[in-house]
C-alpha cells in the first residue's frame, strides 16, 4: 500500500514536470497568410499566401528551430509584415498565433515577435534571408 502511494506521488510529480516543460510554440496549418504594412501606418493589406506544403514545412522547421526569448518587447515602429498559419480544411486560423516581422535597419536581419506569447528573436543573417524569401518571395537585400 505504501509503495502505491509513493508510485502515485512520483508519477504525479513527473507529469507536472512534463506538462510544465512543454511550452513549445505549435505552428499548425497548411497555409501561411502574409500581410504587409501600408505606408508608415499601423494598417496592413494582404500581401502573399504560402500554400506549397514543402515551403510551409520549411517555414515551420525554421520557426521551431529558433531559440525564442521570453520577453515583452516594444518596437519603435509597427511591424513591416505580419503572418499566421491557417488550415485550409477548416477555413480558420489554426492556433491564433500572429508573427510580427521587422526588417533590421542594416536590412540583413529580421526580428520576430509573437506578442500573445511574449516571445522575441533577432535572427542571424542566414536564417533571416531564408525565412524572408519563403514568406515574401523576395530577397531580403532587395527590400
Language-model features, listed with the residues they occupy:
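Sec-dependent bacterial lipoprotein signal peptides
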Residues: 1-21
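Function-determining sites in protein domains
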Residues: 3, 21-143
Amino acid at each position: 500500500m505504501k509503495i502505491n502511494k509513493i508510485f502515485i506521488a512520483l508519477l504525479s510529480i513527473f507529469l507536472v514536470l512534463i506538462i510544465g516543460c512543454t511550452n513549445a510554440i505549435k505552428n499548425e496549418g497548411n497555409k501561411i497568410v502574409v500581410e504587409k504594412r501600408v505606408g508608415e501606418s499601423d494598417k496592413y493589406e494582404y500581401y502573399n499566401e504560402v500554400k506549397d506544403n514543402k515551403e510551409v514545412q520549411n517555414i515551420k522547421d525554421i520557426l521551431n528551430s529558433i531559440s525564442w526569448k521570453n520577453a515583452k518587447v516594444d518596437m519603435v515602429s509597427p511591424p513591416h509584415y505580419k503572418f499566421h498559419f491557417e488550415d485550409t480544411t477548416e477555413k480558420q486560423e489554426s492556433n491564433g498565433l500572429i508573427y510580427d516581422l521587422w526588417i533590421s535597419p542594416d536590412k540583413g536581419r529580421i526580428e520576430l515577435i509573437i506578442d500573445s506569447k511574449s516571445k522575441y528573436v533577432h535572427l542571424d543573417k542566414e536564417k533571416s534571408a531564408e525565412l524572408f524569401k519563403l514568406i515574401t518571395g523576395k530577397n531580403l537585400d532587395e527590400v
